[in-house]
Every structure is written in C-alpha cells, then in structure tokens.
From Swiss-Prot:
A motif (Nuclear export signal 2) lies at residues 261-279. Residues 1154-1344 are annotated as: Required for nuclear and nucleolar localization. InterPro entries: ARM-type_fold (IPR016024), DNA_pol_V/MYBBP1A (IPR007015). This is Myb-binding protein 1A. Keywords: Acetylation, Activator, Biological rhythms, Citrullination, Cytoplasm, Isopeptide bond, Nucleus, Phosphoprotein, Repressor, Ribosome biogenesis, Transcription, Transcription regulation, Ubl conjugation. One of its GO terms (biological process) is regulation of G1 to G0 transition. Pfam families: DNA_pol_phi (PF04931). Residues 1170-1187, 1301-1316, 1331-1344 have a biased composition (Basic residues). Residues 1247-1256, 1317-1329 have a biased composition (Low complexity). It comes from Rattus norvegicus. Its main location: nucleus. A motif (Nuclear export signal 1) lies at residues 238-256. Residues 1-24, 696-752, 1150-1344 are annotated as: Disordered. GO terms for cellular component: B-WICH complex; cytoplasm; NLS-dependent protein nuclear import complex; nucleolus; nucleus.
Length: 1344
C-alpha cells in the first residue's frame, strides 16, 4: 500500500500516530488514484478516455516513483485479465502513458510484460491470457509511437511476434498483422535488416497465409531490391500461382466475416496487378473464374467490396471490362434475390463506394457519367437492379447530370437493349415462359424504371444550379403523359422525339402518376420566391402555360384523351381566371385559389369528364368570393342570405380530398383556410355528414372514394420487379392462406340449404340403386351419376363461399377507404378550429366530435385506421378546441340552447361506461361554461392581488349574471346532480379530477356545490364515497380562488361545518376493517390537517379543544394497529397523518417514541403475527435464548434513574428548538420508562412518550412554550417538576412494577449491546484497544 499513497504526504509511522485530517486526505487520494484503473476497464469509450487522461494528469502533478511503478504494474496486469473486453483498454492506456513519459524505457516495460506473463512457464489454463497479454503489450509499445525509434525494443518485439505467430488457434493472424503494421512504419534501412528474419525465401510459405502474402507485398512495395535478393524474381500472377492466390483470398474473406470489410491483402493484390499491367488476368482468372466459380457468400461479398474499392483506381477501358463482366452479373443477381429485410443485402455498401467515387471526381464528369450509366445498365430482364431513388446522384456535377438525363431520355424513347448487361436468375432460367422473353416486356420494364428515376433525380437537385434540368424533366413527363406528336415543329423540341417501340398505355399511365408525383416534389421542395424562379411563378403555373401552348399547336400536337368543346372552354375560362387572380397576387387567398385552379386544371388532362364540372364550379366560387370581398363594407342586412358559393366550394374540396394525393390534400387545406371564415351551417353540415357514421353509412354513394390507378400500377410494378423466387414463395403462402380461409368459412357458416341439397342428392343416389336392395352396393352407373351430382353440388358451394369471401374483402376495403376519407375530412375541421376559433359554428362541432370519439373508443381494438381517426379527433378536440385561447363571444341569442347543451353533456358524461369517454364530455361542458361566462373570469383574476382574509371578495352572483350569459343557478343544479351521482353511485364514470378542474376554473360554482360535499363527508354514505368527499373538500379548501368568494363570517361558518362533520367520522378512527374504511381514515386526517392549517394561518376563532381530546384518545389504538401490522401498507401513513394533526394542535411527536415504533418487537404469540411469518426469519423455537443480566449494582441503578428523570421531566419540544443529541440515545431508550429516585425522593413521572398532553394553562390551538435547558438541569438536581395532567385512560400505566420495567429494559438492551460489540470488532486497533480497556475497568467495578 505504500505505492498507493500520495507523494505530497509524508508516510506516517502508524495509523494511530497520524492525525485524523492527514489520514482522511491520504485515503481520499488513494481512492481517487485507484478509481482510475476501474474506469479504464469500463466498456464505455468516453469513460475510458476520461480515466486515462485523469491518470496521466494525476501522475504529472504528483511525480512519485511509487505511484508510477504501481500504475505500470496495474496496467501490465490488466493486459491479461480474464475479462477479454478490458485488455485493449489497458493496452491503450499503457500506450498513452508511455507516450507521455518518454523517460520510461520500452525494453524495461517489455521485460516486465514477459516476466509477468512468461511464455515458457505458462500452463494450459493460463495460455490464452498469457498469449494475449504479450500481444497487447507489443501493440501498446507500437501505439506509443516510440517503438520504431528504439531499435533494441523493436527487434525484441519482432522476435516476440514471431513466436506468437505459432499459436494460431488462439491468436489467429493477429501477430503477423501487427508485424506488418509495425514494418510499414519503420525506416527503410531498418526494414532491410529485419526482413530476412521475418520472411523466408520459400514462395510456398509466402503463399500459404494471407498475412505472409501481405508481408511479401509490403516488402515488394518498400524494398523491392532486398526482396528480390531474398526470394528472387517472382511473377505472382503466373498460371502456377493463380490457385494459391484464390485460396488465400478465400481464407482472407472468411477471416473478415464478422468485421464485414475488405481484406487488405485483396486491395494490395489489386494495386500490384494494376502496377504490373496484369489487371485483366487478375480480374478474370482470380476473381471471376476462381472465386466466383463456386461462390460462397463471403467470397461474393469480398468481390463486391473489391469492385467498389477499385472504381477510383481504374481507367475507362478497365471500367468497361469490370462493369460488363461476370462479376457484375453476379452482383445484379444478388441484388434481385436478396430481400430488403436481409441484413446481408449489399446496397448500402455499394452506395457508399459509389458515392465516395463520385464525390472524389467532381472535376471529371465523363467518369461520373460512365459509372452511373454502367450501374443503370445492370438489368434483370429489362428492369435495372439499382433502386430508382439513389442518393449518390446528388454528387453528380451539372455536366454529368445533364448527360445522364439525356441518356435516360434517349433510352426511354429508343431503348438500346444490346447495351444492357441483362441476366436472368436461376429460377427464371428454369421456368421458361414465352410471354416473358419478348422485347416488348423488357422495354416496358425499362421505361417504367427510367421515368421513376427521372422524377427521383429532382429530389437531389438544387434549383438555383439545376433549374434547366428540372424544367427538362418536367416538360418531358408532361408531354408524354398527355400529348402525342402529329407533326414535328422546332418550336416544340419534344415533337422531334420518336419512339422505336410504341408507347404502351401501361407506360403512359406510369408517366401520368409520375408526373403528379413530380408536382408534389416541386411544390414541397421548391417553394418559389420571386428571386428563385422565372418571373416568380410556381412550377405548376409554368407547366400549365406549357400545356396551354401545346393545346394551341393542335396541328402539331394532339391530346392522348381528346377534349370536347365544353372541356376546352373550361380550360380557356380557367386561363382567364388565372390572369384575374394574377392581378391580386399579393393576397394569400388569391394565391391559394390560383394553386387550386392550376392543380385541377392539370387533372383535366387525366380525367376530363370529372374535372370539367369541378373546374367550372371552382371558377364560379372564386368570382363570388372576390365580389363579396369588394362588398364587405356594406351593412349586414343580407347576412341571412347564405353565400351558396361557400357550400359549393366545400363540396368541391371534399371531392378533391377523396383522391389519394398528398399534394391535393395540402392544397385543399390551404384553400379551406382562406374560405372558412365565410363558412355557413349548411357548409359545416356537409363536412360533418362525412364524419357522422349514421348518415355516412346510408349515403355511401354521395362521396366516391377513388382507388386510383396509381396503386394498381404500383402493384403491377412490384409484381414485375420481383424475382421468380419471391413469386413462388408468395403463391405458396397465398394458396395456404386461401385454403385456411376457405376451411374457416366452411366451418364457420354451414349453409342449411346446402345440407338439404346434399341430402337430396344422396337420397336420389340410393333411389337410383333400387328400394329393395338398400343394403347392397350401388352399381357403376349409379356411382358415376352420384359422383357427378356431388361434384357439381360442391363446385357450386365452393363458388358461393368464394363469392362471400370476395364480398367480405370488398366491404372491408370500402370501410378502410371510408375511414381514410374521414381522416382527411378531419383536416378541414382542424383548419376551421385553428384559423377561426371565435366562429359561432365552432360550438356545433362539440357533439359530432364526441360521437366520433365515443364510437372509436368502443371499437378501440380494431384496425390502425380506427386508431388514427380516434387520435386525430381527440387531439383536435382537446388541444385545438377545449384549450384554445380564443373562443366565441357572440352567444347571446343562443344562450338558452347552450345551457341545455351543457346539461345534456353533463348527463351524457354521467351515463358513460368508460371514464375516459366521460372525461371528454365533461371537458366539453367546461368549454361551454367558458364561452357562456365570457371575459369575467379574466377580470376577477386580475383583481386577485392579496392572500388570506385581506383579499377582496369576488362580485356577487347577481353581478356575474349581469356581466355574462351564464345562468349560475341553472348550472349549479346541473353540476350538483352530477356531483350527487359521483358521491352516491357505486360505479360512476365521473372522477374527482373532473370536479377539481371545475372548482379551479369556476370558484363561484364551487362555492355553491360545497354544501353537497360537506354533507357526504359523514353520514350513511359508503366509506369510499366519504373518502372521495374528504379529498374533494380538502383540495377545494386549499384553493386560493375559493377563499375570494367567501366573506369572513361565511368562511368561518364553513370551517365549523366541516369540523362538525369530521367529528362524526373521527369516532371510529383506528377501527377500519375494509380497504374503503381505511381510505376514509386517511382522507379524513388529511382534511383535518388542511383545516387546522387554515385555522392557524388565518387565526380563526374556532375551538379545537374537543379534537385534541378525541385524537389523544385514539393514539393507543393507532399505535396498536401499527405494531400488529393491520393494513401494513397504510398504517404508517395514517400514524404520520395523526401526528401531523397533533403537531398542528401543539403536541410534538416525541423523537424517542418515533424510534420505538420501528424497534418494538412483535409478540410471537399474537394471533395476527402468527398468520403470516416474514421470509428469512427463524421461528421463535429456533432462536437462542437471551441471557438475562442478574447482577446489577446500585451505581448502575442510580445512573439509570437519573437518566430517566432527565428524559421524563423534559416536556414536548418542537423540532427546531430541540437540543442536539449528546450521544446517549441508547441508554435513554432503554431506561425511558424507569421511575427515577434522586436522593431517596421519588420524582413524579412525566407522561409516557406515547401520551403527550398539554398543561391546563396552555391554549389548545397553540404550541406550548419550550422549557429551557437550565430548567431541565434543575429538575435533575432534585427539584420536583410540575406534572402535567394526564388522561384517565392512561393512568393505569403507572401501576407497572419496577421489576417488570427493569426486565424489559435489560432484554431490549441486549441486541443493541451486541450490535455495538460487532461494530467495535470492525473498528481500527487503536479504537479497539481503548474500548477494551474501558470494558475491563467496568468489569472490575461490577465484581463484588
């Protein structure tokens, strides 16, 4: 331990002679020093580094040889600890220590390591730790950065690593790898000297291990002349060495299986092949014909990683060789076969390699373009294997991106199938289908992928830099989605583009869906500002202008779906309306209308018949909206005439919401946010009709939820892109599921009609055989006829089951679409509540939203869409509606209806089966109260400046009624009925927090409801309801807002009523038998404590003497229940509440009594204690009997009597004025109940600690004064103190004999004495010697 001591302190001769402060500081320094080594071995890297830094700082600031030696010893020992994860931590710490203290010799450290972990003396059990300790020791010396400068230590480490390399079973190739790392940094002269010692001249040895080959490649790179003199001229890529290289690469691939990285030897071989111009032989013969001849997944992944790592090293010709060989086809097959959930999928790694390559050659667009085209050309029957959304495209520079987009466009128009590296999987080759091998299918799959890749490119573009590319892609998609060329013209470049394969309808549908996806990307990613886009126009507007220009060139361009005259007229009117809106472009509402028009106008080309009518209605609504905006200054004389255009607009927006388009959903939200201020009741009912389940079920056909062709196309794309393996597996699973569902349907609903038909067929078969030959077998003709009839019957039944199953799936799908449409329709409700919280129509949303919540809560275990609908509705209702800062103020005409709605909501809350649903209804009623009350609550809160009785009282009830629409009497009756329901019904959905929220918001209502609560505190109510009433009353009385509503006499009268009710319940305190009764006792004491605090704080003239006597009479019962373990989970809480009440009445809980409550042993013969014994305790019969002390001297008796007088004469004192402990608690506890005699005079015993009382002169509600210390000393010296008055029920305790008290005191003192002896036995020798001397002296005195 001398090494662990701080060098700043002189080493003490012994612990006894060291001062206390010096010994403490020495221990602290030692503990701090030792903690460093514990933290170094922890798995958290930050903790290890922090501990290492602190250790180095500690050693720098306290330079001491002993601590340095100990640190080195601990770190060297840690190199071979049993926990393998800690060995590298100690190695790194040792390296940093050697790096910081360069005066430490490396040879000495290496010698200590070899001495601690001797390779010659190790046994079998210590072999692995010894080997790793030597290896990590060498690594520590190398990581310190000083090994290459110390030749002697370097040679020793090389020899040690050479010895360790023979233990391959434990260390694998780590020693040779460490040797390669060391030699890669040594000077060339030293390398030449070490090389003959570590590398033999035999090529068989070199080609036997990846590490030896890596050492050979390192020597060939650094000292080729010395290597040639040692090995000779070697052609590593000769025909003879190719098999050995293949085997070495296989071993290297298996060695990095867990690390999932490229072996260094493979990359070094690639560099050597490039250097010697033998790359083609290496790639074809070693990789493609060697490793991939019978590939394993480790060899395949090594080849894939080598492909990615070789990209920056290859020339254009070599890139063409690599990207069109067998390896790239094997890579493509892996991409197709591996699933997205497969952890071995290689797409993240190849993306990292390609991204690094593209980022590194930003100034070479040709190489970027070549690599992108090469990876795009890897196709499986025409479908490229790379994902359409590939993040590496963001590294393309402008020229490479433009060339790549041009190549994609040309491949879409005139596919060059010969330039593709196409392949088929094993299953595709096995299952040869003639329809799948035609060029048309290959072109269809290729074009579908290309159009999605073009759209995905826009996500990675910067508009400022690549605006031309974005416009080129958008024009291409728009033209080929909706138009076709009649005659080429130079004004439209797209007309010069010709297809080598005709564009099929399937491809055109893909282009249409991709075009609207592109609109979504452009609207979200590129939100135009005037300084970014041409003339500050959004992309949608520019595309509409392009479409208008194409429509005008009808000689050169034709629509794919021709427009009628009416549809063309609707388009022209839209363009004129856009010009009108353009003049008002500064208004946000005009911008929203413009965006809606543009989007619906583009949908005119997709579905002309549907969009034409919608387009006309939108224009009509926009014009009427603008006209009403101009006439806004007029009077509201025509306010009763509802603006029909708003209702039409709502219908339009609802129909647009039915389309599964996120872009359309955003536009609808934006437009509705600008028109919702003009919303009418009829318009709101149109929205609520979608959300209302009753009308929605009956009118399902009113709003058609479209399941667009986008999903079907996506499904077809997935079906085409999947491999045959997935097809087969999915078909098997589907067939199994179909069989199981059919069996379930057959078992679940047996058709009686089918059973009757089956019986008729069987009877007809029997009749065909003849009535007289019933017991004989049927003939062949009869059997054939019976089989045919049965087969047709079962076929019909199977068709009926299949039809029912399809009908069930159809209904389920329709239900999902309907729920999804309702979720979208909630967007309009959310916009209305957020944008117009003061709109009168907001009040009509309460009950419809509550109906949705109630219905969804009833079916909460259903689909995810039901859950989403519930969560969104609840969020809108609670956060945006009930908790909104603003609300409607114009409710005077409908105040009576609102009061009726409050009553209805409160009654519905009380009738719910679920408390969570009742909470929503109750909060809705509170929201209506807030609306009815208006701004009066805010005015009262502004006047609340003071506390207690000095606060100005709130205005009277009549004032409240005159300043707001709230009918206080009516509301009081409503909530009093619900409060009665809470405090009387057995299972009420109403809860205490609901009424606490009501009381805190509306204290005037709370004042009117308090008599009901006080009435249920006692009486014939259930104990649980009484406990709820006490809790509600306690929280209400503590509220500051309630006190403002009471005058001082009213408040004092209320407190007296509460105390009178609690007196009835206190009669049974401590006699609880059930859980509800016990909860009532806890609640009544908490209420009493609150009332006592109010009385003391406000100094109310309330007499509490009766409560003092009543509580003192219950003390013994409560203490007995606590000792016996009755209701053990809450007895201590009840006892604490009791003493809190006594403390508020002026009686302090004695400290000694509080200790005795925990230390009193339970009686083993008690019937309650024998019911259930605690685990881990011996029974009474197995315990050793305690020895009784018999020889007690008179001196000991006198001392105990004097201590008893000291404690017994001491009155109750408050905690803050209590004198500090003198260290004699044990003797005071033992002798507390002993009658004291001083000089032969018996001193009157003070009240027992269990029964503290007040003197007659002390006021009942005030704490008695604390006696001073000198008075206590005078009592000890012989003066007789004045004994306070004790209750009659407690005087029987004075009849206890002195003998019994002595016996109990001696028995209770024995365990504590033994505990103290055990503590002494663990104390230092100095303390033990002093205690031993005092113990011997005491024995001598006690011996007669």
């Amino acid at each position: 331990m001398a090494e662990m001591k701080s060098p700043t302190k002189a080493e003490p001769a012994s612990p006894a002679e060291a001062p206390q402060g010096d010994r403490r500081s020495l221990l602290e320094h030692s503990r701090e020093f030792l903690d460093f080594f514990w933290d170094i071995a922890k798995p958290d890297q930050e903790t290890r580094l922090r501990a290492t830094e602190k250790l180095l700082e500690y050693l720098r600031t306290r330079p001491s040889d002993s601590e340095m030696k100990y640190a080195l010893k601990r770190l060297i020992t840690g190199l071979g600890v049993g926990r393998e994860a800690a060995r590298p931590c100690y190695s790194l710490a040792l390296a940093q220590l050697l790096q910081s203290f360069e005066d430490i010799q490396l040879c000495d450290i290496l010698g200590q390591i070899q001495e601690k972990y001797n390779l010659q003396a190790m046994n079998k059990a210590m072999m692995r730790p010894t080997l790793f300790a030597n290896l990590f020791g060498v690594l520590a010396l190398f990581q310190s950065g000083r090994l290459v400068k110390d030749k002697e230590a370097l040679m020793k480490c090389v020899r040690l690593l050479k010895i360790l390399s023979h233990h391959y079973n434990h260390l694998q190739g780590q020693p040779v790898k460490a040797l390669v790392d060391i030699l890669s940094e040594v000077p060339e002269s030293m390398f030449q000297e070490i090389l003959p010692k570590v590398l033999k001249g035999d090529m068989k040895v070199i080609l036997s291990s990846p590490k030896y080959l890596e050492l050979f490649l390192l020597a060939r790179q650094r000292v080729p002349a010395e290597l040639e003199s040692l090995v000779g001229s070697v052609d590593l890529f000769s025909e003879d060495n190719i098999p050995s290289l293949v085997n070495i690469l296989k071993v290297a691939a298996n060695s990095v299986k867990k690390e999932q990285k490229l072996p260094d030897v493979a990359l070094n071989l690639l560099r050597l092949a490039l250097q010697e111009n033998k790359f083609e032989r290496f790639w074809k013969e070693v990789l493609e014909e060697g490793l991939l001849k019978k590939p394993s997944y480790t060899s395949s992944y090594m080849c894939f990683r080598l492909l990615g790592a070789s990209l920056p090293l290859l020339s254009d010709e070599q890139l063409q060789l690599v990207m069109r060989g067998d390896l790239i086809r094997h890579f493509g097959e892996h991409m197709v076969v591996s699933k997205s959930q497969n952890p071995l999928r290689f797409i993240p790694e190849i993306s990292a390699y390609v991204g690094t390559f593209l980022e590194g050659c930003q100034d070479d667009p040709k190489r970027q373009f070549t690599v992108m085209v090469a990876f795009t050309a890897i196709t499986n029957q025409g479908l490229p294997v790379m994902p359409t959304f590939w993040r590496v495209t963001r590294f393309l520079n402008t020229e490479a991106l433009q060339n790549y987009v041009t190549w994609l466009r040309d491949m879409f128009l005139q596919p060059d199938l010969d330039s593709l590296v196409d392949f088929s999987t094993a299953n595709q080759k096995r299952v040869q289908v003639a329809s799948l091998n035609v060029p048309e299918r290959t072109v269809f799959r290729l074009r579908k992928w290309i159009i999605h890749r073009l759209v995905s490119l826009v996500d990675h573009l910067h508009l400022e830099k690549d605006e031309a590319v974005v416009e080129q892609i958008a024009r291409f998609c728009l033209f080929h989605a909706f138009f076709k060329t009649k005659k080429a013209t130079p004004q439209i470049p797209e007309t010069k583009q010709h297809f080598s394969f005709p564009l099929e309808d399937g491809n055109r549908g893909v282009i249409v869906s991709a075009f609207f996806s592109l609109l979504q990307t452009l609207s979200v990613k590129f939100r135009q500002t005037p300084d970014l886009a041409e003339n500050g126009k959004p992309w949608t507007y520019r595309l509409v202008q392009l479409a208008d220009m194409l429509l005008k060139h009808n000689r050169n361009v034709a629509n794919v779906t021709p427009l009628t005259a009416q549809q063309r007229q609707a388009w022209d009117q839209m363009m004129s309306t856009l010009k009108e809106l353009e003049a008002q472009s500064s208004e946000t509402r005009a911008i929203a209308f413009q965006h809606l028009l543009l989007l619906v106008g583009l949908h005119l080309f997709k579905s002309p018949a549907e969009s034409c009518d919608v387009l006309g209605d939108i224009q009509t609504c926009i014009k009427k909206s603008m006209e009403q905006n101009l006439r806004r200054s007029r009077s509201r004389a025509k306010a009763s005439q509802e603006p029909v255009w708003v209702e039409v607009m709502v219908e339009i927006l609802l129909s647009l919401l039915a389309q599964p388009s996120n872009l359309m959903r955003q536009v609808v939200r934006s437009v509705f946010g600008h028109v919702c201020s003009h919303l009418t009741p009829r318009g709101l009912q149109l929205i609520l009709a979608v959300l209302n389940p009753e009308t929605n079920e009956d009118e399902e056909d009113n709003v058609v939820v479209t399941d667009t062709d986008e999903k079907q196309l996506k499904h077809g794309e997935d079906a085409d892109s999947d491999s045959e393996d997935s097809k087969n597996s999915e078909s098997d699973v589907d067939s199994e599921d179909g069989e199981e569902s059919e069996e379930e349907d057959r078992d679940k609903d047996v058709d009686p009609g089918f059973r009757q038909q089956l019986m008729e067929v069987l009877q007809a078969g029997n009749a065909l055989g003849g009535e007289e030959e019933e017991e004989e077998e049927l003939g062949d003709e009869a059997m054939m006829a019976l089989d045919q009839n049965l087969a047709s019957l079962f076929a019909e039944q199977k068709m009926r089951i299949q039809a029912r199953h399809e009908e069930k799936n159809k209904l389920q799908k329709e239900k999902q679409l309907r729920r999804d449409f309702q979720i979208r329709a909630l967007d309009l409700i959310e916009v209305l509540v957020t944008k117009q919280p003061e709109h009168p129509l907001i009040l009509e949303l309460l009950e419809p939203l509550l109906n949705i919540i109630q219905r969804s809560m009833r079916s909460r275990g259903s689909t995810k869409q039901e859950q989403d609908l519930l969560h969104k509705t609840a969020r809108i209702f609670m956060h945006h509606l009930c908790r909104a800062r603003h609300y409607c103020h114009e409710v005077e005409p409908g105040a009576e209806a609102l009061h009726a709605q409050v009553e209805r909501l409160v009654q519905q809350a009380g009738n719910q089966a679920d408390a969570s649903v009742a909470l929503y209804y109750f909060n809705a009623s509170l929201y209506l109260l807030r609306v009815l009350k208006g701004n009066t609550t805010k005015r009262y809160q502004d006047g609340q400046k003071l506390e207690g009785a000095d606060i100005k009282s709130e205005p009277k009830d009549s004032e409240v009624q005159t300043t707001s629409c709230l009918d206080l009497d009516f509301v009081t009756r409503v909530y009093s009925a619900s409060l009665e329901s809470l405090l009387t019904k057995r299972n009420s959905p109403l809860t205490i927090p609901m009424f606490l929220d009501l009381f805190s918001r509306y204290p005037v209502i709370c004042k009117n409801l308090l008599p009901i609560v006080v009435q249920h505190v006692a009486g014939s109510s259930r104990p649980r309801h009484q406990a709820q009433a006490c809790l509600l009353l306690q929280k209400a009385l503590s509220a500051r807002e309630l006190r403002v509503c009471f005058e001082d006499p009213e408040w004092e009268q209320l407190i007296s009523q509460v105390l009178g009710k609690t007196t009835q319940t206190l009669q049974t305190l401590g006699e609880a038998q059930s859980k509800g009764e016990h909860q009532r006792e806890l609640s009544i004491l908490e209420l009493l404590n609150t009332v006592f605090r109010i009385v003391n704080h406000e100094k109310l003239s309330v007499d509490l003497t009766a409560f003092l006597g009543m509580l003192q009479g219950k003390q013994q019962k409560l203490q007995q229940n606590l000792q016996q373990g009755n209701h053990s989970s809450g007895s201590s809480r009840l006892y604490d509440l009791y003493w809190q009440a006594m403390n508020l009445l002026g009686v302090q809980r004695p400290k000694s009594e509080k200790k005795n409550v925990k230390d009193i042993p339970s009686d083993s013969q008690s019937p309650i204690s024998t019911k259930r014994k605690k685990k881990g305790f011996l029974p009474e019969t197995k315990k050793r009997k305690k020895l009784k002390s018999e020889g007690t001297t008179s001196e000991k008796k006198a001392a105990s009597q004097q201590d008893a007088v000291t404690e017994g004469a001491m009155p109750a004192a408050t905690g803050k004025d209590q004198p500090p402990s003198t260290g004699k608690k044990r003797r005071k506890r033992v002798k507390a109940n002993t009658p004291s005699q001083v000089n032969g005079v018996t001193v009157a015993k003070s009240p027992a600690p269990n029964n503290p009382t007040l003197s007659p002169s002390t006021p009942p509600a005030k704490t008695p004064k604390v006696q001073k210390k000198k008075e206590k000393l005078s009592q000890v010296n012989g003066s007789t103190p004045v004994s306070p008055v004790e209750p009659e029920s407690k005087k029987h305790q004075k009849a206890l004999s002195t003998k019994e008290v002595k016996r109990r005191s001696s028995q209770s003192a024995l365990p504590k004495k033994r505990a103290r002896l055990s503590l002494v036995s663990r104390s230092p020798s100095l303390l033990q010697s002093g205690i031993r001397k005092r113990r011997v002296a005491r024995r001598r005195v006690q011996t007669p």
